[in-house]
């Protein structure tokens, strides 16, 4: 049987994604109820980090432990990858010793090549192009608060970055309408815009983009590696700050999400995270449950499901 990987949301069918989101919600309830479920006893997750993270490391490492497995953290200084070993060689060796691998790195081509030569599932835990694990948590969070996101309106505010690209893929897979409000010069990848033009549109006025939206999402103005552009970006993105008054223009049942960390006073107003329509804390916790569901799905042929 061929190995399944999760490099973008397009690697799973819409039906598989919907089932995974519902399973993640079940796993959250099981965890909160104190139920012990350990299908990964004797299994090992290799975690390759070339970009640092709080939520990604904690959620994967904790999730593997809760499942009864073991996680190994590998930074560039811990592997021969950091010394120039070819990706195909590292992929063959590491995958021969672990059951599943997650990679958080810069170039998306790196995870694609790793998957090409790996004998076990590869999970993209973030690249410069996509952040699909975050979208699993976001879709789970919407499902838990509002039910199905199909045919809803989602508004992305800010940089057309890897999170925006992942929301574009999510619009296609989950069947919602995505509006993107981004400053000129910071629009999403044009190839993705063309690919997903049936469900994604650019809206010039950010207030118009927020009208009747069921979900409003934003991210930092300068992503990791763009710190030198911070001042320039701050000037260009200032009109795109998400505030409670912006949410007032949306649907009465609107939710607000942010993948965190957030910069209060920049992409969001100081009071936005504390607004009752904000679900960022559930969203952050759901990284744990969504990724547990993902790992369970990718290893389902090797474990006993509960």
Swiss-Prot record:
It is an enzyme of class 2 (transferase). Its main location: cytoplasm. It catalyses: carbamoyl phosphate + L-ornithine = L-citrulline + phosphate + H(+). It is found in: Cytoplasm. Signal peptide: none annotated. The keyword Amino-acid biosynthesis applies. The keyword Heme does not apply. GO terms for molecular function: amino acid binding; ornithine carbamoyltransferase activity. InterPro entries: Asp/Orn_carbamoyltranf_P-bd, Asp/Orn_carbamoylTrfase, Asp/Orn_carbamoylTrfase_sf, Asp_carbamoyltransf_Asp/Orn-bd, Orn/put_carbamltrans, OTCase_ArgI. GO terms for biological process: arginine biosynthetic process via ornithine; citrulline biosynthetic process; L-arginine biosynthetic process. Belongs to the aspartate/ornithine carbamoyltransferase superfamily. OTCase family. Reversibly catalyzes the transfer of the carbamoyl group from carbamoyl phosphate (CP) to the N(epsilon) atom of ornithine (ORN) to produce L-citrulline. HAMAP family: OTCase (MF_01109). This is Ornithine carbamoyltransferase. It comes from Psychrobacter sp. (strain PRwf-1). The gene is argF.
